[in-house]
Amino acid sequence: MRLLLRNYSLMEAVKRLLPRPRKKIYNLGACFELVDIPKISYNPSELSEPRFLEYSNLSDKLHLREAIDKILIPRVVGTTNHSIVREYIVQSLRDLDWDVEVNSFHDHAPIKGKLHFHNIIATLNPNAERYLVLSCHYDSKYMPGVEFLGATDSAVPCAMLLNLAQVLQEQLKPLKKSKLSLMLLFFDGEEAFEEWGPKDSIYGARHLAKKWHHEGKLDRIDMLVLLDLLGAPDPAFYSFFENTESWYMRIQSVETRLAKLQLLERYASSGVAQRDPTRYFQSQAMRSSFIEDDHIPFLRRNVPILHLIPVPFPSVWHTPDDNASVIDYATTDNLALIIRLFALEYLLAGTEAK
């Protein structure tokens, strides 16, 4: 992914219409201005308290760690390890009775030449009319002479999605026949091989968004939620897009309810974090810049996006230190729980008995 500042003159015009930022944060040379999220009357359905408590106690931490271990190897597109990880993801979901399609295509990449890419598309009901799409990328960055594992980028997000499918097997069964269902999407080729640009990055996302646009399938996506750079301690998330702000507030609400019930781990079991984590999902929105990532081809085609990526990025981003040692398992377990409950609330709240 890459940080981008928007066109200067356009942004100056937009800034004049925005509330005064409370503060600024800086990351990789780019400045993000934060504005408070306005309080709105939107109140989507919530899970009943008994259901929320019941689902909060569902977990399989051992499976999550095993999934991370399986994926946490160098997995550059075109390598044997890349195929191993792809087959692991595909088989894991097929074993859980998901319908899995591998969208294969080839493209030319700098340095590497012609490469074969494979997006993984898993659905509970391939004939559903609408989908909540949870997504991440599974390739790792090409770094000659360096063993780059990409723990946060994006072994942990991949493992979180597989763990969600594992933990929620029973709860997701109704979605095999419902009009609204769940899709797990693992993009290939997110990383650039030489220098990030329109033809050297997000290969899988660019291909799939274009394909689905021509096939008329993008209209079936309620919202695409993209997970990236997760697993390091003390992340801070923000709302990037106004049209999904109500759903950002819902995931923020899930975190708040879990914290009040003391169901979030407060200390890191990995020893990475030396203090209690602060709130993950911040009560501010970013309005003056955005991050290039797998969501961009879908955003340009008017698909609603919820981008779950921490700002600032983890300090180990695109370095050999993005390995197992950076993973804070308290944070990882907490985020996995929040995302599971958010998905259940989105998909099931309207049908649950109050």
UniProtKB/Swiss-Prot annotation:
Gene3D superfamilies: Zn peptidases. The active site is at E190 (proton acceptor), D228 (proton acceptor). Disulfide bonds join C136-C158. Its EC number is 2.3.2.5. Coiled coil: none annotated. It comes from the Eukaryota. InterPro entries: M28_QC (IPR037457), Peptidase_M28 (IPR007484), QC/QCL (IPR040234). The keyword Transit peptide applies. Changing C136A: Does not affect catalysis, inhibitor binding or protein folding. The keyword Mitochondrion applies. It is an enzyme of class 2 (transferase). One of its GO terms (molecular function) is zinc ion binding. Residues 1-8 form a transit peptide. Optimum pH is between 7.5 and 8. Keywords: Acyltransferase, Disulfide bond, Metal-binding, Mitochondrion, Secreted, Transferase, Transit peptide, Zinc. Zn(2+) binds at D153, E191, H318. GO terms for cellular component: extracellular region; mitochondrion. It catalyses: N-terminal L-glutaminyl-[peptide] = N-terminal 5-oxo-L-prolyl-[peptide] + NH4(+). Inhibited by imidazoles (imidazole, benzimidazole, 1-benzylimidazole, 1-methylimidazole, P150/03 and N-omega-acetylhistamine) and cysteamines (cysteamine and N-dimethylcysteamine). Inhibited by PDB50 1(3,4-dimethoxyphenyl)-3-(3-imidazol-1-ylpropyl)thiourea. It holds the Pfam family Peptidase_M28. Belongs to the glutaminyl-peptide cyclotransferase family. PANTHER family: GLUTAMINYL-PEPTIDE CYCLOTRANSFERASE, GLUTAMINYL-PEPTIDE CYCLOTRANSFERASE-RELATED. Acts as a glutaminyl-peptide cyclotransferase. Responsible for the biosynthesis of pyroglutamyl peptides. Might be more efficient in the conversion of tri and tetrapeptides in vitro. Might have a relative preference for substrates containing hydrophobic amino acids in vitro. This is Glutaminyl-peptide cyclotransferase. It comes from Drosophila melanogaster. The lineage of its organism: Eukaryota, Metazoa, Ecdysozoa, Arthropoda, Hexapoda. The gene is isoQC.
